[in-house]
Amino acid sequence: MSSQLEQIFARLRGSADFEGVDFSDINACGIDGDNPLHCVVRWGDIAAAKILISAGIDVNKAGDLSYTPLHVACMNGNVEMVKLLVDNGADLFAFNEGDLPFTTARIAGHDQICEFLAPLMQKLQSGDSPIWVRARIAQLRREIARLEASLEGK
């Protein structure tokens, strides 16, 4: 493990959410379900996000309230972070508890992020429609399975 990763994990271990978490799996989650990328996005730490992404962290991991790191960046209004995540495969159509990252940015009043995301979303939707529909169906099936699993645990 690189010293840069170790520094990020040391900072995370300092929070109650990640106390005792084994970071031998880079996607290890804290008690609220967030992975390290959620946290560095929340911190606005672009350099740390790049380190985690290059180390193979899941950029689409749903954490607390089903927020992905992209939802967090959109909520916080960090345009540079949004661009970094999108450039590294963040799902523009990931749902949290009912909202897309675009909607999260719109509700938070981050118009610059909406202006960045809208044409990308339109381009994806206007592409090869059958492929897009199949991808959305697969994504929705995963979300339904996740929600059903969470209901079984209650």
Regions inferred by a protein language model and the residue ranges of each:
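Ankyrin repeat boundary/linker residues
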Residues: G30, G63, F95-N96
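Ankyrin-repeat-protein effector appendages
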Residues: M1-R13, R106-K154
